[in-house]
Amino acid sequence: AKMNLSSYILILTFSLFSQGILLSASKSIRNLDDDMVFNTFRLGKAFQKEDTAEKSVIAPSLEQYKSDESS
């Protein structure tokens, strides 16, 4: 239990630390950020195309998720 707690604190500290760095450096990496968002958007489009091909596999679990959420 102690090991899990320490690793959790480490992860928490790291995430806060990295957020702080991103926040302070956001002005200099704003262009890079926009590129990343654009690439992620294009990636999402590509995944959507694949998704339509795999819908027959994914659909059942997706429907179950929707019904779980509404209850």
Swiss-Prot record:
Assigned keywords, A-Z: Secreted, Signal
Any single GO CC term annotated in Swiss-Prot or TrEMBL for this entry: extracellular region
Signal peptide (from-to): 1-20
InterPro entries assigned: Prepro-melanin_conc_hormone (IPR005456)
Main location: secreted
GO biological process: chemical synaptic transmission
Entry annotated with the keyword Secreted: yes
Superkingdom of this protein's organism: Eukaryota
Protein's cellular compartments: Secreted
Family: Belongs to the melanin-concentrating hormone family.
Protein name as catalogued: Pro-MCH
Species for this entry: Hylobates lar (Lar gibbon)
